[in-house]
Amino acid sequence: MARIAGIDLPRDKRIVIGLTYIYGIGNTTAEKVLAEAGVSEDVRVRDLSPEDEDKVRAAVDKLNLTLEGDLRREVSLNIKGLQEIASYRGIRHRRGLPVRGQHTKNNARTRKGPARAIAGKKK
């Protein structure tokens, strides 16, 4: 099992998909990493040679990406900063409501959580 940036990549997937299991690497970045490393996107993780693994690790380091714990910390600090300055976005985060302008009259159940029954309200 290949271990890159502290994450075990799934053995049965193609390397381009396996890299997306690392927080902070999506499809486009995974393709850039593999192009930098000179490794084919179609190779399965289990078929990677140790040299190819080292090339991919070096390419991830060379691209100077913020990944995993550092990226999660950065995002949470950004949200915390928005809350501290009491911006509109920070208030929406604090209240657990949609941040990006979605309507909340009918939907937004993902952000608001399960519906709560209101006493005395009938159809």
From Swiss-Prot:
One GO MF term attached to the UniProt entry: rRNA binding
SUPFAM superfamilies hit by this protein: S13-like H2TH domain (SSF46946)
UniProt xrefs under InterPro entries: Rbsml_uS13_C (IPR027437), Ribosomal_uS13 (IPR001892), Ribosomal_uS13-like_H2TH (IPR010979), Ribosomal_uS13_bac-type (IPR019980), Ribosomal_uS13_CS (IPR018269)
Recorded GO CC terms: cytosol; small ribosomal subunit
GO BP: translation
Stretches the record annotates as Disordered: 94-123
Keyword Metal-binding recorded: no
Keyword rRNA-binding carried by entry: yes
Keywords, comma-separated and alphabetical: Ribonucleoprotein, Ribosomal protein, RNA-binding, rRNA-binding, tRNA-binding
Highest taxon above the source species: Bacteria
Family: Belongs to the universal ribosomal protein uS13 family.
Oligomeric and partner information: Part of the 30S ribosomal subunit. Forms a loose heterodimer with protein S19. Forms two bridges to the 50S subunit in the 70S ribosome.
Job description of the protein: Located at the top of the head of the 30S subunit, it contacts several helices of the 16S rRNA. In the 70S ribosome it contacts the 23S rRNA (bridge B1a) and protein L5 of the 50S subunit (bridge B1b), connecting the 2 subunits; these bridges are implicated in subunit movement. Contacts the tRNAs in the A and P-sites.
Name of the molecule in the record: Small ribosomal subunit protein uS13
Gene behind this protein: rpsM
